[in-house]
UniProtKB/Swiss-Prot annotation:
Residues 8-19 have a biased composition (Low complexity). It is a lipid-anchor. This is Regulator of G-protein signaling 20. Keywords: Cytoplasm, Glycoprotein, Lipoprotein, Membrane, Nucleus, Palmitate, Phosphoprotein, Signal transduction inhibitor, Ubl conjugation. The lineage of its organism: Eukaryota, Metazoa, Chordata, Craniata, Vertebrata. It is found in: Membrane; Nucleus; Cytoplasm.
């Protein structure tokens, strides 16, 4: 019988057999090799899973759009919470304020001063309707949002509403950005670190003055105001 090297294999002497009881022969050697091979593959088996584990952990720190790990799922859910809250707060300003039909005396008083117009919901509604025709309704919306903010007392709500107002009307990236001078913007930017309900007071005053000097005179000569005044005058005559 030849060895694996091709040479003749020495016969095992009776005295050597007790010393080599554990050496496998024939099919036993083949079986042991198979076990070693299987055992090697089993020991190497966990490596891909560990590598995969490292991949999933690394995935948590990437920003690829294909990532579906649970870490980013939680992060996405957290990112959506303020968006939902922002949407709920944004609906606080209705498209039109609830108000009774103004009287002829009220509408005539709007022509006497801008304050008389802005103090009543009906006056603000009519003015907003006019501002829409000039594509400048954001001025009134900003002013109204500031009025709401000043009525808030809860700190977290104040911070959230201040952030929304900033994003909607102060940010240069917003399509509804209002016209403010650089000094007022700088003050707002500094105070956004810890906003109060009066953070936009200077900006609100600037926009109020802008509407008073620029939009209000045109409103008084607009069809929106004149048609409302005429309809109320006719109803008064009929009565």
């Amino acid at each position: 019988m030849r060895t694996a090297n091709g040479g003749p294999r020495a016969r095992a002497s009776p005295s050597a057999s007790p010393a080599d009881p554990g050496l496998p022969e024939g099919s036993e050697r083949t079986e042991m090799r198979m076990r070693q091979m299987c055992g090697g593959s089993e020991t190497q088996g966990p490596a891909p899973s560990q590598q995969g584990g490292r991949g999933s952990n690394a995935c948590c720190f990437c920003w690829c759009c294909c990532c579906t790990c649970s870490c980013l799922t939680v992060r996405n859910q957290e990112d959506q919470r303020p968006q939902r809250a922002s949407h709920e707060i944004r609906t606080d300003i209705p498209a039109c304020e609830e108000s009774p039909t103004p009287t002829l005396e009220e509408v005539c008083a709007w022509a006497q001063s801008f304050d008389n117009l802005m103090v009543t919901p009906a006056g603000r509604n009519a003015f907003r309707e006019f501002l829409r025709t000039e594509f400048s309704e954001e001025n009134m919306l900003f002013w109204m949002a500031c009025e709401e903010l000043k009525r808030e007392a809860n700190k977290s709500t104040i911070e959230e509403k201040a952030r929304i107002i900033y994003e909607d009307y102060i940010s240069i990236l917003s399509p509804k950005e209002v016209s403010l001078d650089s000094r007022v913007r700088e003050v707002i930017n500094r105070n956004m670190v810890d906003p109060s309900q009066h953070i936009f007071d200077d900006a609100q005053l600037q926009i109020y003055t802008l509407m008073h000097r620029d939009s209000y005179p045109r409103f008084m000569n607009s069809t929106v105001y004149k048609d409302l005044l005429t309809s109320l005058a006719e109803k008064t005559v009929e009565a």
